[in-house]
Amino acid sequence: MPATIDELSRVLRPQMTAVGGKFAYFLEEPVAEEDLRQYLHDPIEALPPTVAELLPRIGIVLAPYLERSSPKAPVTVVSDKPADARLQFSASVNGGDAVTLFFTTREEQVSDYHYYLYDELSTLLASRWPEKARNAWQAMLREELSAEVHGEVDEKSWHLKQALLRKPKSARKEGKQFEEYAARSFADTMTLYLHGICCDIDVESGPRQLPTRYLRKRLELLKGLFPPPEGHAVFPEDLTHHHHRH
């Protein structure tokens, strides 16, 4: 029987190697020493200090493949590639003061792994965000909804936004559905924000994508709330300013 991630998280916790701050890792899939930097050090060092403070202790398990055999079944670590419908790219186990994150890494691009890593971390942040950040984010979304701005940053928030837009205008800007949408849109935008600080990424444009002007406003808000670490930039022009100072 392949081991479930719940079982593995308990077994592997004491065997993990620290990688700075709150992070530790375990390799279920061999990774070359020179590649570890891309998998672990680079994305962790790119985290804003205020983000790192909010996170619990994090264990990262790089696995060959993750499989969920049915929607209700537990996620397991497997060494043979599952069918596409069963393949999971990331999963998490919340152990109270520590969270263990599992990732499919075989045949996966490092940039895709970074996306799933930041998606998992941003989802954790959305349940731990400080009141100041939540209030500022919700105020910005209310402005977007008033201006009838279409599109979102990623699929999950896009679907929640569509459900919200089916409600009468007066009922869109508060209540449980709005708060659920706000948390997910924060997580999805935060994923993009963190990924952008770490790596040179392209934002896909499409009919579902939030217009550039509004995306920029969101990223500027996140930059103000969670400034990037020294030597890292959010926008291309941040880098030029950085060079001028030296």
Where are these regions (language model features)?
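Pan-zinc metallopeptidase signature
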Residues: 1-17, 171-246
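Post-HEXXH active-site segment of zinc metalloproteases
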Residues: 111, 115, 126-164, 202-209
